[in-house]
């Protein structure tokens, strides 16, 4: 997701970025088809994870690392093709009512779980209602993604007690009927999102089912054969998968190493076939040498994702909006992308990134990200004003947390230096292991925290509805009735122009009026792939799909 070149290259990348995203994520697989090797290769794909996946339960996953594994071990009703369009998954066909409120999915009868059991419509109904169950512990961070379904929100919040009132029903073993609250143009694309994946009913009552290969029953192209915490995850081809003849890889080996330098070294030594985004990183200080040495294997691609910091709005000193605004105005985003990340990133002054569809063009083209400017003098005034409002003579001690990663650390240290030089504020930088970091964010046990967000589907709503008062991924404590109403109204209207207007008003409240988030840059994906790896794809939001890849 990270790195930036200089001005001439940036312009080139922006053009490439636009064409890639206009195609909704089609991937050229640069480097994978150039050249070759005389070295014989087994059908084994080797990559690295910078951390252990916090969970392999589709109902609980909320991060790229978890989803990379989950999306190869499970499959939804539809799957995303290489060009970003919906393809048949477990569903062999679907019908949508004229009013857009009812979806009827017909499941293929040859879909099986990895233990040989048939995958049925009941498995989907069970999985979705499991996520929505108000007693589901821990609560699913993505339960709100199912709120498009009739009565889903009311059931999840406890206003409706009977799960049978939720608009999802298996009418027979191979027919799933879904009724929505409102017409939702992107609902079909959500069927390839992990929270909508089926779960085998055997997980009931077994909280640790997703931590062991023998109880982790999936229905995707691969199954987990080995899991050793802090060391590796190994996947093997699932011989029960309905489309197994299209799967060429026999194994996927995932090392777990939290060092971008070690990851790069392993790649150079032919111990990895892939390195970098989305589950690892390429050291930014090595990019110049990599371009000379491994230029044909380097992929730099603009993606629809945003790198940002969040403020805990419930704790001092960031319960004051002027202090939040001062911190956001006092950093130099251009310096960060040109001197640190160096991989085609674009400074961000909004939350929704380029490449996301708007009314008739990209949303970001129709709604420019002019919500604030970098202004040191104004930042100093706002800090002084905020401190006066809080009764401070000295700002309380401030800590910025980030998950352990060399590149996140470089960015955090650079930004803390900017705050010191520009505002006279000392900020402690603290790195945390991924699982600990996520829990501290969720529990609001932080002051400022690193974050990143990629599209779950190609619509601005994927960046907007997460900040509602009950949003499962709203780790800021931000609650705003006007914001919540704008999101609900946007859900309810089928007028696309009106939807965009409502969402742009919500984004203004989030970024300009309240500065809940501090946008830093719009991501690019930087990765390396060996020339013998074929048919590997990164989609418009930067997710990797190796399920149909092969070694040649």
Predicted features and spans:
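Detector for C-terminal structural segments
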Residues: 330-361, 407-416, 438-552
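Alpha-helical secondary-structure segments
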Residues: 120-127, 173-179, 220-221, 249-251, ...
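Aromatic- and charge-enriched surface segment that lines or borders ligand/interaction sites
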Residues: 92-142, 317
């Amino acid at each position: 997701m990270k790195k930036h070149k200089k001005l001439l290259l940036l312009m080139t990348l922006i053009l490439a970025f636009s064409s890639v995203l206009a195609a909704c994520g089609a991937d050229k697989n640069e480097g994978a088809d150039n050249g070759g090797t005389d070295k014989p290769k087994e059908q084994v794909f080797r990559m690295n994870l910078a951390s252990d996946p916090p969970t392999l339960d589709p109902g609980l996953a909320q991060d790229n690392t978890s989803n990379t594994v989950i999306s190869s071990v499970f499959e939804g009703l539809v799957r995303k093709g290489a060009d970003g369009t919906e393809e048949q998954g477990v569903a062999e066909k679907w019908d949508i009512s004229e009013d857009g409120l009812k979806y009827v999915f017909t499941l293929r009868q040859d879909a099986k779980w990895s233990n040989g059991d048939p995958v049925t419509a009941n498995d989907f109904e069970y999985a979705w209602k499991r996520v929505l169950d108000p007693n589901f512990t821990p609560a699913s961070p993505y339960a709100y993604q199912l709120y498009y379904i009739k009565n889903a929100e009311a059931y999840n919040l406890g206003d409706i007690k009977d799960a049978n009132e939720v608009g999802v029903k298996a009418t027979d073993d191979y027919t799933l009927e879904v009724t929505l609250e409102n017409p939702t143009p992107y609902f079909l694309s959500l069927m390839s999102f992990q929270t909508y994946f089926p779960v085998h009913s055997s997980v009931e009552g077994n909280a640790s089912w997703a931590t062991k290969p023998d109880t982790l029953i999936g229905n995707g192209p691969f199954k987990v054969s080995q899991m050793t915490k802090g060391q590796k995850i190994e996947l093997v081809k699932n011989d029960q998968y309905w489309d197994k003849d299209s799967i060429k890889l026999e194994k996927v080996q995932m090392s777990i190493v939290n060092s971008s330098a070690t990851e790069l070294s392993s790649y150079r030594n032919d111990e990895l076939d892939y390195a970098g985004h989305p589950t690892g990183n390429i050291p930014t200080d090595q990019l110049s040498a990599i371009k000379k040495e491994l230029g044909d294997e380097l992929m730099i691609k603009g993606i629809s994702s945003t790198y940002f910091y969040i403020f805990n709005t419930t704790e001092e000193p960031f319960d004051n909006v002027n202090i939040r605004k001062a911190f956001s105005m006092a950093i130099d985003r251009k310096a960060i992308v040109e001197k640190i990340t160096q991989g085609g990133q674009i400074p961000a002054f909004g939350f929704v990134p380029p490449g996301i569809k708007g009314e008739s063009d990209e949303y970001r083209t129709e709604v420019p990200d002019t919500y604030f400017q970098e202004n040191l003098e104004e930042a100093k005034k706002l800090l002084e004003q905020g401190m006066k409002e809080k009764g401070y003579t000295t700002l309380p001690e401030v800590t910025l947390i980030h998950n352990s990663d060399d590149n996140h650390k470089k960015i955090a240290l650079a930004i803390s230096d900017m705050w010191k030089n520009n505002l006279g504020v000392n900020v402690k930088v603290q790195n945390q292991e991924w699982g600990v970091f996520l829990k501290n964010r969720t529990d609001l046990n932080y002051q400022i925290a690193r974050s990143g967000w990629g599209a779950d589907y190609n619509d601005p709503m994927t960046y907007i509805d997460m900040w509602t008062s009950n949003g499962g991924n709203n780790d800021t404590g931000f609650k705003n009735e006007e914001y919540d109403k704008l999101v609900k109204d946007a859900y309810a209207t089928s007028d696309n122009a009106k939807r965009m207007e409502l969402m742009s008003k919500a984004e203004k409240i989030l970024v300009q009026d309240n500065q809940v988030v501090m946008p830093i840059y719009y991501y690019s994906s930087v990765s390396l792939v060996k020339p013998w790896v074929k048919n590997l794809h990164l989609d418009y939001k930067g997710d990797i799909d190796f399920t149909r890849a092969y070694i040649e």
